[in-house]
Amino acid sequence: MTTTHILGYPRIGEKRELKFALEKYWRGEIDQAALKQVGSQIRQKNWALQKEAGLDFVTAGDFAWYDHVLTTTLLLGHVPKRHSHGFPDLDTLFRVGRGQSQNACGCGTGSAASDMTKWFNTNYHYIVPEFSSNDTFNVSWPQLFEEVNEALQAGHDVKPVLLGPISYLYLGKEVEEGFDRLTLLPRLLTAYQAILSKLAKQGVQWVQIDEPILALELEPRWQEAFKLAYQVIRGDVKLLLTTYFDSVLDTLDKIVELPVDGLHVDISAAPAQLETIVNRLPSDWVLSAGVINGRNVWRADLSAILARLQPVKTLLGERLWVASSCSLLHSPVDLDLEGDLSAETRSWFAFAKQKVTEVALLGRALEGDAAAILACDTYSQPIVARKSSHIVNKASVQTRINNITAALAERSAPYIERAHHQAEVLGLPFLPTTTIGSFPQTGEIRTERSAYRQGKLSEQEYVQALKGHIADAVKRQEALGLDVLVHGEAERNDMVEYFAENLAGFQTTQFGWVQSYGSRCVKPAIVVADIEREKPITVEWSTYAQSLTSKQMKGMLTGPVTILCWTFPREDISRQEIAQQLALALRDEVADLQDAGINIIQIDEPAIREGLPLKKRDHQTYLDWAVQAFKISAGSARPETQIHTHMCYSEFNEIIESVAALDADVITIETSRSNMELLKAFEEFNYPNEIGPGVYDIHSPNIPAQAWIEDLLRKAAEKIPAQRLWVNPDCGLKTRNWPEVEAALTNMVNAAKALRAEWQA
């Protein structure tokens, strides 16, 4: 028998039931019992789906109220002291993830949420564990055991999933100086022993223990920690050591020495590792082959996968398991919900529910089931047809791609010359003030957008409504005294989806939601074909806004790499080529904007760093083509057209050369929370172009004082020549309300004016 399973299933519910229940609970509209009932219903449905599809195990422990790393933190009794008030409960978990205001806690100070960061190179976020020297661990949070029991009582064969001890430590951070979190390992392992012992007593036979950091380039001390850890926690349950997102060949020497019972590897992300792993697999281990991609939306080529695995099946027999490459939480829930897709387009996709069916069908085919083998061949036919589809391949796009030259990615003059031209044309003051692009998406804007999409507003009525919001934004900015204005992006629901809806080559969905963190879900567009701009996208809005003011108006574009990173890409061509196609489309938009009289154009690239591959040796190749894509986008700009970009990172050191290579005339960055410390990277590199360090944190409702902003600007001027500084917030203002925005920007503009007077005296 070929054992079939998945590494996890989406926890949000097919129509985001968990999101809505969580938000009702946080607003006080339902109690904990009602919230838990929603969670139970989602789990029961997920398990039933896996069983009905024919999987040998259902996966328990993949459900999380906020984030699975945070769930592990509570399971281990490792709650930060500022959030620990007696025995942990759901509210404890939410305090760690979301923080608590002083009014809610009654303590007069509130408690800050733990940090949140990206889960490897996905668009999912996790709550970062915090470690200090006096930490203890105790198994006090019953969620995992309750859910295992729940699944057992429903008659399922259960395989719990547990984040492994080394990855848990690695993914956290020390909160005291001079302390190494790896020294906590012996204490942590005692807790893991207790967890595995308890699962064994519940009748569990296999535990999926996730150690995704084994796909990274680990320092020797972290590699050595695995052997100690697994010698200690080895007990009465079988352990499936689970890795994903990249190859584990770098750490395979250490892996095969571990006292575990099986290994899961991501064959989808790193297909070349399969043969080596099969040859080196210990004779008593199972191999779980992650061949169904858990991170995409594409139908699997089951016929090709079957052909690849049949020799492995011959070698390993029942020791071969078939699985998803990673948890399916990175995929939308159910393709069956999509009512607006054409039959041809639908045949290209598989969401989480369909991927479960793919795993089960592949397992039956590997057992020699003739009907299943035939079904695999039939299932793969749309993939073959898609390769020659006129919808997918466009000769006009391919011609442009083939004609890309180095000159296409260069401005027509170096920065020093451009800066001179721009100073003459733009006429901006010393320390120019601006914002990053978006203004509040008010309830009125959202209502109008919804009415338009439902056909309750005509296109003409909707356009007029949006123009009213743009005019209001321009009027407010002029009253505030900003130097460079923006139109406010009232027409955009999302900075990526907006461009996906207006570029040929994308497919958007109705219910293609995936979890980002907590209750936040995103609905990435899908790149289905060659990308082309068929008509101008932003020109009408920007030129209308420019017609309302004599001040400079910024055109606002989302950059090619960010659009790529925040969508589901094609897999029949390289990510580099998709980025090039996007860059060419945006290049045309830049040309049209400047021809229409827009002299400043911002090309946002907040995701360039997020797109870095997991292994450092692969970074430069990625950065080279990412930089090229940006420069192709900006390459149509004349010397007098000023190109801005915006990035929000917490770490620039490792990519500062590539940031400089973008050759943007102005870069705006997120720096206020770091007290301008992030500028050190630019100072040490001697960054040559202009910089707008964010002077206040837009994620906080707090209004920054003028003196505080002045102090930040003084610190910035110690690192960057004041003549090259801009004054702006950290990020867009979409999520704030107008009173907050106007109060903060008033102080920001006044701070700039005060320092102009002082420094130019």
UniProtKB/Swiss-Prot annotation:
L-homocysteine binds at residues 436-438, 489, 604. Pathway: Amino-acid biosynthesis; L-methionine biosynthesis via de novo pathway; L-methionine from L-homocysteine (MetE route): step 1/1. Its cofactor is Zn(2+). 5-methyltetrahydropteroyltri-L-glutamate binds at residues 16-19, 118, 520-521, 566, 610. L-methionine binds at residues 436-438, 489, 604. CDD domains: CIMS_C_terminal_like, CIMS_N_terminal_like. The gene is metE. Gene3D superfamilies: 3.20.20.210. HAMAP family: Meth_synth (MF_00172). It catalyses: 5-methyltetrahydropteroyltri-L-glutamate + L-homocysteine = tetrahydropteroyltri-L-glutamate + L-methionine. It is an enzyme of class 2 (transferase). It comes from Vibrio cholerae serotype O1 (strain ATCC 39315 / El Tor Inaba N16961). This is 5-methyltetrahydropteroyltriglutamate--homocysteine methyltransferase.
